[in-house]
Structures are given as C-alpha cells and as structure tokens.
C-alpha cells in the first residue's frame, strides 16, 4: 500500500448533483426545481419561521420570564475546586487567581460537591449548610 494508491471505499463517496447539464442527466433544464413558482426562482423561498401569512408560532405564544443579570456575575464553587487554590485562605481574588472562576464573577457560593482535603479558611463567600459542615469537619473555618 502506498500513498498514491489510497482511495475511498467503494460507495463511500457520492458524485455531486450536476444541475442543468442536459436532458439526459435527469437534472437538466429546470434543474430539479419544477416549473414556475417562488421556489423555482433565484433567491426564492421564504424566511425562517414564515408560515404563509398565518400568525407564526413565535408570535402566537406569549413572552415569558427574563434573564437575571446577577446570575451572569455569580458562580458556584465545588469543594473539590478549593484544592486548586494556593494557600489556606480562600476568597474571591484567590479563586480568580487559581482560574476556578472567571474574572467577571462578583459573587460565589461554595457548594457540597467533592471533598475538601485540607483545612481552609473561607472569607467573604457564601457557603451551603452541607459545605459548611464538610469544611469545619476538615478543620477549616468560615469568616463572613
């Protein structure tokens, strides 16, 4: 086997449709578009969501909800992520320095997911009840 003898398996490749190349091709003259009408024209067709003039679904259904702007700057931190932080004190800046949270994050909450291996001091972060118990069991403490 040589590079110049390699070829795709039989039937793996399909020849492209060659439109408008004579009556014998089966796709000559109208090129598979039929006769007349909007879709036979160049640039023909309707926009996405158009239902022929009927009130479209996206306008029939009511608007609902909103996106909380605070959610965009809030993040959850797993207990297992605390191991990535250098030092014993964990706060917003040390989490950002360790790339645990993004730089745009302003609020963080430590949640019970994974395990905390060493005693750490949590400063200025919110902590769930389960995470608080796990941190204190490991010898750490939480400062508000």
UniProtKB/Swiss-Prot annotation:
Entry keyword set: Ribonucleoprotein, Ribosomal protein, RNA-binding, rRNA-binding
Top-level taxon in the UniProt lineage: Bacteria
Region described as Disordered: 1-53
Claim: Lipid metabolism is one of the keywords in the record: no
Compositionally biased tracts (Gly residues): 21-31
Single GO biological process annotation from the record: translation
Coiled coil (residue ranges): none
Recorded GO MF terms: rRNA binding; structural constituent of ribosome
Keyword DNA damage: no
Assembly: Part of the 50S ribosomal subunit.
Role of this protein: Binds to the 23S rRNA.
Protein name, per record: Large ribosomal subunit protein uL15
Lineage: Bacteria, Pseudomonadati, Pseudomonadota, Gammaproteobacteria, Enterobacterales
Gene: rplO
């Amino acid at each position: 086997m040589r590079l110049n003898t390699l070829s795709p398996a039989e039937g793996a490749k399909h020849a492209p449709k060659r439109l408008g190349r004579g009556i014998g091709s089966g796709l000559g003259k109208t090129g598979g578009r039929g006769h007349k009408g909007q879709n036979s024209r160049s640039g023909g067709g309707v926009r996405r969501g158009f239902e022929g003039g009927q009130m479209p679904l996206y306008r029939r259904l009511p608007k609902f909800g909103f996106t909380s702007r605070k959610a965009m700057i809030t993040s959850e931190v797993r207990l297992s992520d605390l191991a990535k932080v250098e030092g014993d004190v964990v706060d917003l800046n040390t989490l950002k320095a360790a790339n645990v949270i993004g730089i745009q994050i302003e609020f963080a909450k430590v949640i019970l997911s994974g395990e905390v291996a060493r005693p750490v001091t949590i400063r200025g972060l919110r902590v769930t009840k389960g995470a608080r118990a796990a941190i204190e069991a490991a010898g750490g403490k939480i400062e508000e």
